[in-house]
Amino acid sequence: MKEKIKHIKFDNKTNPKSYFEVVQLEELLNRKLDHDICKNHIVKFYIIIFITEGNGYHTIDFVDYKYQKGSVLLVRKDQIQKFSKSATAKGYLLIFTEEFIVSHINKLEALKSFQLFNELISFPKIELQVKELEFSDFYSLMEQIVSEYKLKDEYSISITRSALHILITKLFRIKFNNGQLPNKKKYLTEFLLLQDMVEKNCFANKKVMYYAQNMGCSTKTLNNIVQAIINKPAKNFIDEIAITQIKRLLIGTNESVKEIAYTSGFDDPANFFKYFKKFVGSSPEAFRRSHQ
């Protein structure tokens, strides 16, 4: 498969073994890199973007999210993103890998932390109340992380990990209080297992029955699991993941639409065209052109 856009791996040249980096947004927008951050690129790490001043927008998986002072944007590993130039925007990016989180906390807590970045469970943007303690409290914690990152003594990494875990937990609280997290936790573990299964197999099989059998449950139970967490039928959930992955192939590779149709599990490109247009509202070719 020919890659069309950059796959950006974690690369902290000053401290490569830390698996963590802090970057000022305004500095990043003017930094000379080997890729254009204002064009689509795939990230192989996690990002928390905190806006302290100004406004603009950031694109995650082909959706533009407007931001302003107090906005927090969450990008998970393997998503496609691009920045937009802004003359007023200031803020921080916390960039880190799975290793940075997993090496500090137990597996259950680590899995919970990564749920924050799961766009299928919750919206990838949080608005902090600028005039309330919520903003100043978050800002203070961010400044502590920045300070420890700059200090770079033998204790800095441990303190930074702990502070990041607190920051992620605070974001969970804010999302919960804003009604941005699922109320029912009964099926959350099963949902995450299903999501992983669908993301790995949706091109080979898009049928609810297939996933129900592999989960060891009935199609009714599978629908209950998905409805409880994201309030959608299981088939819609499967198609949503498949469409996102098809979009990534259209933008991220040089494969022809016909080749992508076959890769996506369609024997007939005409059926692929109908499937894509049904969910996106445009043809695969038109979608590709609009994001070049």
What positions do the PLM features span?
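A hydrophobic/aromatic-rich effector-binding and dimerization subdomain
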Residues: 5-13, 17, 86-147
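Short hydrophobic/aromatic patch on the recognition helix
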Residues: 70, 222-223, 271-272, 276
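Terminal helix-turn-helix DNA-binding modules in bacterial transcription factors
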Residues: 228-273, 286-292
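Short acidic-glycine-tyrosine-enriched beta hairpin
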Residues: 62-74
